[in-house]
């Protein structure tokens, strides 16, 4: 019985780890990367970013109300 509990707990920890990486860690890294490189990306890098946005869309949706990628305009009045 004890091995079943340990096995279930290990499975639960693995699932929580994978879900947190998929929904939290990689989308935040992707937001940071897009925010810093948006205006200087080449076409292949942009293609990779579009693929990653498609792949990690659920995590990006979680952070979209709090982060935005608006372009910085001139600070002239």
From Swiss-Prot:
GO terms for cellular component: plasma membrane-derived thylakoid membrane. NDH-1 shuttles electrons from an unknown electron donor, via FMN and iron-sulfur (Fe-S) centers, to quinones in the respiratory and/or the photosynthetic chain. The immediate electron acceptor for the enzyme in this species is believed to be plastoquinone. Couples the redox reaction to proton translocation, and thus conserves the redox energy in a proton gradient. Cyanobacterial NDH-1 also plays a role in inorganic carbon-concentration. This is NAD(P)H-quinone oxidoreductase subunit L. It is an enzyme of class 7 (translocase). Its EC number is 7.1.1.-. It is a multi-pass membrane protein. One of its GO terms (molecular function) is quinone binding. The chain crosses the membrane at residues 12-32, 47-67. It is found in: Cellular thylakoid membrane. Keywords: Membrane, NAD, NADP, Plastoquinone, Quinone, Thylakoid, Translocase, Transmembrane, Transmembrane helix, Transport. HAMAP family: NDH1_NDH1L (MF_01355). Belongs to the complex I NdhL subunit family. It catalyses: a plastoquinone + NADH + (n+1) H(+)(in) = a plastoquinol + NAD(+) + n H(+)(out); a plastoquinone + NADPH + (n+1) H(+)(in) = a plastoquinol + NADP(+) + n H(+)(out). NDH-1 can be composed of about 15 different subunits; different subcomplexes with different compositions have been identified which probably have different functions.
């Amino acid at each position: 019985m004890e091995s079943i509990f340990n096995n279930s707990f290990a499975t639960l920890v693995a699932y929580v780890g994978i879900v947190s990486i998929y929904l939290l860690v990689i989308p935040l890294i992707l937001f940071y990367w897009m925010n810093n490189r948006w205006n200087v990306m080449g076409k292949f890098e942009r293609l990779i970013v579009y693929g990653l946005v498609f792949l990690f869309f659920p995590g990006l949706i979680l952070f979209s109300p709090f982060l935005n990628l608006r372009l910085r305009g001139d600070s002239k009045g």
